[in-house]
Amino acid sequence: MGRPEFNRGGGGGGFRGGRGGDRGGSRGGFGGGGRGGYGGGDRGSFGGGDRGGFRGGRGGGDRGGFRGGRGGGDRGGFGGRGSPRGGFGGRGSPRGGRGSPRGGRGGAGGMRGGKTVVVEPHRLGGVFIVKGKEDALATKNMVVGESVYGEKRVSVDDGAGSIEYRVWNPFRSKLAASIMGGLENTHIKPGTKLLYLGAASGTTVSHCSDVVGPEGIVYAVEFSHRSGRDLLGVAKKRPNVVPIVEDARHPHKYRMLVGMVDVIFSDVAQPDQARIVALNAQNFLRNGGHAVISIKANCIDSTAEPEAVFAGEVNKLKEEKFKPLEQVTLEPYERDHAVVVAVYRPVKGKKV
């Protein structure tokens, strides 16, 4: 019996898959097709496969995964098909990959639809609970048929017609994480005028747009021009979103665009966040209005304990005529984050 031929690019993939073979040989190979592959294949690939996720190995095992090696093990593991997290943005990821709205399949993670899906109203106005195999938060889609960041959509027939809901992923939105964490009231409801500081690519802004509805308005402020481009794309399809690409430290630069608002939501992750919120409140927030502030402890003081940082920020808000109402941490969705709700210049005798 002769030695097997080491084919560098042939039809069958050679001894271990060849370098660019058609099928990738017996278990995947370096660049082959069938099951592993560095950039090819059907199941394992680093960047190209159908099932394997981000870490499918360099030609890994039968199912992809971190331990597949160059022509290696049988099933792999870390980012493979059966992984509880599905790789970085893989098939079953509850996080759906973080970051940009161009997340491809990643954002589809989070909820398994099932045949029977029931939608019930949440105690907070404009927010809903989708009950299937798993429960999830959702908002009524203002732009039917459109996903913003790859999130799942659920259509329910209510007799008069079909209503579409967008699943709200708490791993991608700090506001959703705070609701899941038990926040009593976000004060964002249908008809609310909202000033959103730190809008990023418009992920949470799009859900706020759904919540406030056509009677409300969302002024979305983002300093980064790159994120601002994505935000503009969201605003083009949503008439109640006003995109503002400007520094939230200088509210006078956009004072001609923003009217008086009921709520300020802040997610700017800056050391002087309390001051930024106070400046915007002085310009735009009505007396008795509310601020909902997402605090990232590491951005304010990376050496102190998170609880001490949160307490320090609350004290700064008190100095700026805010009265804190409630505070929740965002575990397990975000580490060392808290959301604080405060009322601005509370009106005597009026419920806050």
Curated annotation (Swiss-Prot):
Gene Ontology BP, a term: nucleologenesis
Modification after translation, per record: By homology to other fibrillarins, some or all of the N-terminal domain arginines are modified to asymmetric dimethylarginine (DMA).
Signal peptide: none
The keyword RNA-binding is assigned to this record: yes
Localization of this protein: Nucleus, Nucleolus; Nucleus, Nucleoplasm
PROSITE patterns referenced in this protein's UniProt entry, alphabetically: FIBRILLARIN
Top-level enzyme category: transferase
UniProt KW keywords: Methylation, Methyltransferase, Nucleus, Ribonucleoprotein, RNA-binding, rRNA processing, S-adenosyl-L-methionine, Transferase
Taxonomy, superkingdom: Eukaryota
UniProt-listed Pfam families: Fibrillarin (PF01269)
Modified residues (Asymmetric dimethylarginine): 8, 16, 19, 23, 27, 35, 43, 51, 55, 58, 63, 67, 70, 75, 81, 85, 91, 95, 98, 102, 105, 112
Segments of skewed composition (Gly residues): 8-18, 26-59, 66-113
Annotated GO MF terms: histone H2AQ104 methyltransferase activity; RNA binding; rRNA methyltransferase activity
InterPro entries reported in the protein's UniProt record: Fibrillarin, Fibrillarin_CS, SAM-dependent_MTases_sf
The reaction(s) this protein catalyses: L-glutaminyl-[histone H2A] + S-adenosyl-L-methionine = N(5)-methyl-L-glutaminyl-[histone H2A] + S-adenosyl-L-homocysteine + H(+)
Record note on quaternary structure: Component of box C/D small nucleolar ribonucleoprotein (snoRNP) particles. It is associated with the U3, U8 and U13 small nuclear RNAs.
Entry function: S-adenosyl-L-methionine-dependent methyltransferase that has the ability to methylate both RNAs and proteins. Involved in pre-rRNA processing. Utilizes the methyl donor S-adenosyl-L-methionine to catalyze the site-specific 2'-hydroxyl methylation of ribose moieties in pre-ribosomal RNA. Site specificity is provided by a guide RNA that base pairs with the substrate. Methylation occurs at a characteristic distance from the sequence involved in base pairing with the guide RNA.
Annotated family: Belongs to the methyltransferase superfamily. Fibrillarin family.
Protein name: rRNA 2'-O-methyltransferase fibrillarin
Protein source organism: Caenorhabditis elegans
Gene: fib-1
